[in-house]
């Protein structure tokens, strides 16, 4: 079965596959040619996931700007 194109995958599914690829590559028990294919797939997944995340952030900003009552505040990763 052919792998789904990253752009057709749900964000969470792409991250799960990317995590699996990272674990395989870190194990070191994979042939060079297979490792290169996995690395290439991982790069595609990472780029597509980043694009989807950026789009989601932009949607949130637009929704917050549409509500004049709600102030737009900076996102803080550490919840501080």
UniProtKB/Swiss-Prot annotation:
Entry keywords, A to Z: Cytoplasm, Exonuclease, Hydrolase, Nuclease
InterPro entries referenced in this protein's UniProt entry, alphabetically: Exonuc_VII_S, Exonuc_VII_ssu_sf
Keyword Cell division: no
Cell compartments where the protein resides: Cytoplasm
One GO location term (cellular component): cytosol
Organism superkingdom: Bacteria
Biological process per Gene Ontology, one example term: DNA catabolic process
Catalyzed reaction equations: Exonucleolytic cleavage in either 5'- to 3'- or 3'- to 5'-direction to yield nucleoside 5'-phosphates
Pfam families noted in UniProt: Exonuc_VII_S
EC number: 3.1.11.6
Main location: cytoplasm
GO molecular function: exodeoxyribonuclease VII activity
Annotated family: Belongs to the XseB family.
HAMAP family recorded: Exonuc_7_S
Function per UniProt: Bidirectionally degrades single-stranded DNA into large acid-insoluble oligonucleotides, which are then degraded further into small acid-soluble oligonucleotides.
Subunit composition and interactions: Heterooligomer composed of large and small subunits.
UniProt name for this protein: Exodeoxyribonuclease 7 small subunit
Source species of the chain: Photobacterium profundum (strain SS9)
Gene it is expressed from: xseB
